[in-house]
Amino acid sequence: MTVYHFVGIKGTGMSSLAQILHDMKHTVQGSDYEKRFFTQTALEKRSISILPFDKSNVKEGQVIIAGNAFPDTHEEIVAAKELNIPVHRYHHFLGDLMNQYTSVAVTGAHGKTSTTGLLAHVMQGAHPTSYLIGDGTGHGVENSKYFVFEACEYRRHFLSYNPDYAIMTNIDFDHPDYFTDINDVFSAFQEMALQVKKGIIACGDDEELQKIQAKVPVIFYGFGEDNDFQARNIQKRTDGTIFDVFVRNTYYDTFKITGYGNHSVLNALAVIALCHYENVDVEAVKHQLTTFEGVKRRFNEKPMGEQVIIDDYAHHPTEINATIEAARQKHPEREIVAVFQPHTFSRTEKFLDEFAESLSKADQVYLCDIFGSARENKGELTIEDLQKRIDGAELITDTTTDVLKKHKNGVLIFMGAGDIQKFEAAYVKEVQVAEK
């Protein structure tokens, strides 16, 4: 019996892949640092063994899958090579696995995780579908027809894949620690487009995506009239969003989604376009769109007393704009309060003015210290550089969150890709203690 051993099993992609293989009835185990990470919960539910790093974990007959964060000098990878066991890097293993199915890569600077989650949910309503989402969620079905997965452009990782289809949500400049400018980002997506085997579903409202060249059909979606799939007559309600879809200027159907904001309409439109292309029953698509509950750390909302708390992964100005817009649609009468932790010094410095502009769309802004990456030089930048660009912005720590209590009927949006949840947890605890 083959044992799949994951070196770095708590990584979001690695955890998802481990879950998929386990669900397909393979024997799976893995190793990682002992510090608790949110991806553990799904692994523990499946009784997948998580071991501390140790070269003795590696044994003959195993299939070794290594996370990209771990160099060839890692003790377990060295041990595998000493035993002449091939080491498969995460992206290469995933690339080989998906060739067994009709594969759909979901990529773009923003909206990947939400769109992957939505597509997987909708496809499952019609056909057996395995999926891998970048929030640490994976699900494998032995007789899958489709394999839906999130494909990240960072360090051009997505070039490990040759999917049947690709959904491209947008192209935007991000990851300034790797990409030099928007042209560098575009070149990565252009290279990816040439690897797609059947078709590309791309947002035609995005100026960069309009320039994409491909060997396969490119289907455009969006709000503009030039798109193949266009959303019209949009009704933004507090219980979701309703819109008509026109296919090449001919009415197709009316859809209701559970999401808020223009970006949610675009994500749904991408899914509708792909399903139309694959002849998925439209009634199944309509039903599944109304039952989607979202993905982890993407506009996750919970009431707390008179306040509403939203947890969101937004860490780029474009994403902050979208999250605040969605909150205003759902809660038009409430005060919108942004609690933001910038992620990486390089990104914060590059987009300092854009961050200030997007955050200023909230009624009140609180800023947490910059969450730095282990790989980067801190430099001269401080959180005060952002604070002075936003009228009335205040600094907050995980010991001073009680200041948020004064926003009696407020919607508190905790945003960031670092450990912003630490601040949210501190505030929730503060409120619970006060109520006792």
From Swiss-Prot:
Where in the chain are disulfide-linked cysteines found? none
**InterPro entries for this protein:** Mur-like_cat_sf, Mur_ligase_C, Mur_ligase_C_dom_sf, Mur_ligase_cen, Mur_ligase_N, MurCDEF_pg_biosynth, UDP-N-AcMur_Ala_ligase_MurC
Write out the transmembrane intervals: none
Q: Which GO terms describe its biological process?
A: cell division; cell wall organization; peptidoglycan biosynthetic process; regulation of cell shape
Which species does this protein come from? Bacillus cereus (strain AH187)
Name of the protein this chain belongs to: UDP-N-acetylmuramate--L-alanine ligase
Q: Which gene encodes it?
A: murC
What role does this protein play?
A: Cell wall formation.
Name its pathway. Cell wall biogenesis; peptidoglycan biosynthesis
UniProt-annotated location(s): Cytoplasm
What is one GO cellular-component annotation here? cytoplasm
State the reactions this protein catalyses.
UDP-N-acetyl-alpha-D-muramate + L-alanine + ATP = UDP-N-acetyl-alpha-D-muramoyl-L-alanine + ADP + phosphate + H(+)
- Species lineage, top-down? Bacteria, Bacillati, Bacillota, Bacilli, Bacillales
Q: Which UniProt keywords apply?
A: ATP-binding, Cell cycle, Cell division, Cell shape, Cell wall biogenesis/degradation, Cytoplasm, Ligase, Nucleotide-binding, Peptidoglycan synthesis
Indicate which residues the UniProt annotation says bind ATP: 108-114
The family annotation for this protein states: Belongs to the MurCDEF family.
- Name the enzyme's class: ligase
